[in-house]
């Protein structure tokens, strides 16, 4: 079984083949997800909420992401492994280089950073030095206090255009993937069509090249608020591996996300 790389995902986009991603934080779940065919695994700073019990992702450290990245790496053979760069771990290009290096040495294939125009220099410098970058636009959880909560972004024309412009600029700067979160489906479509690189959506409609969800939502073990864009696949299948297969199948055939999981 050949390993998934950024080139694999680019080929999928060119062929119109949808791909799937999930968060993972340990070797056991990562192995199960990898074995069922999940293309991308993300060691997300979401672990601050779903594992550590925080109200947001801000307390997570680079050392914690590196620890979980090492755990996940030991459990996978095929999936592309992305590691989140936590809050304020990439405030300057120099800081980003140091922390991204630590995550790559922990086993990541790529690092993910939240932000737009202010990140362009950092993206270019990381890419030039051999560290692949996945950018993240829309609802960027590390900016939750700036947004005034976890809110859909890009609903008005001005902000939609800004997000589209930032997506193009990040691609030009060297980003190899882009995650768009909680934006209107029409904006996600425009971004996906405008970019050559693959676009992964979460709460962004069905037209993006790939979909990502938090594993706790897919397995119905999240506590408290359940995002509208998520779906509990364990409820309909009764078994973890079957739930993962159902998620993959529904993304592939276009039935997930449906209108119920999408913002306008």
Curated annotation (Swiss-Prot):
Enzyme class, first EC level, given as a word: transferase
Family according to the record: Belongs to the PanB family.
Record-linked CDD domains: KPHMT-like (cd06557)
Metabolic or biological pathway: Cofactor biosynthesis; (R)-pantothenate biosynthesis; (R)-pantoate from 3-methyl-2-oxobutanoate: step 1/2
Keyword Transferase on entry: yes
Cofactor(s) named in the record: Mg(2+)
Reaction(s) catalysed (UniProt annotation): 3-methyl-2-oxobutanoate + (6R)-5,10-methylene-5,6,7,8-tetrahydrofolate + H2O = 2-dehydropantoate + (6S)-5,6,7,8-tetrahydrofolate
Annotated protein name in UniProt: 3-methyl-2-oxobutanoate hydroxymethyltransferase
Subcellular location: Cytoplasm
Lineage of the species this protein comes from: Bacteria, Pseudomonadati, Pseudomonadota, Gammaproteobacteria, Alteromonadales
Keywords linked to the UniProt accession: Cytoplasm, Magnesium, Metal-binding, Pantothenate biosynthesis, Transferase
Catalytic activity, EC: 2.1.2.11
């Amino acid at each position: 079984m050949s390993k998934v790389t950024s080139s694999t995902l680019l080929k999928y986009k060119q062929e119109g083949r949808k791909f799937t991603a999930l968060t993972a934080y340990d070797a056991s779940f990562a192995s199960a997800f990898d074995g069922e065919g999940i293309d991308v695994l993300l060691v997300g700073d979401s672990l601050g909420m779903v594992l550590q019990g925080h109200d947001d992702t801000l307390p997570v450290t680079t050392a914690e992401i590196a620890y979980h990245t090492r755990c996940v790496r030991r459990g996978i053979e095929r999936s592309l492994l992305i590691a989140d760069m936590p809050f304020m771990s990439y405030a300057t290009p120099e800081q980003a280089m140091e922390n991204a290096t630590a995550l790559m040495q922990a086993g990541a294939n790529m690092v993910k950073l939240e932000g737009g125009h202010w990140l362009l220099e950092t993206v270019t410098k990381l890419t030039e030095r051999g560290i692949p970058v996945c950018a993240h636009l829309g609802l960027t959880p590390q900016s939750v206090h700036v947004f005034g909560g976890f809110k859909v972004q890009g609903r008005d024309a001005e902000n939609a255009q800004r997000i589209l412009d930032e997506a193009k600029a990040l691609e030009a700067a060297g980003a190899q993937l882009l995650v768009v979160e909680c934006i209107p489906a029409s904006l996600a479509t425009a971004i996906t069509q405008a970019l050559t690189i693959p676009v992964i959506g979460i709460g962004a409609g069905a037209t993006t090249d790939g979909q990502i969800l938090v594993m706790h939502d897919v397995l119905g073990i999240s506590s408290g608020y359940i995002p509208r864009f998520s779906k509990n696949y364990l409820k309909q299948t009764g078994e973890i591996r079957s739930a993962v297969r159902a998620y993959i199948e529904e993304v592939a055939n276009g039935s997930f996300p449906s209108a119920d999981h999408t913002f306008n």
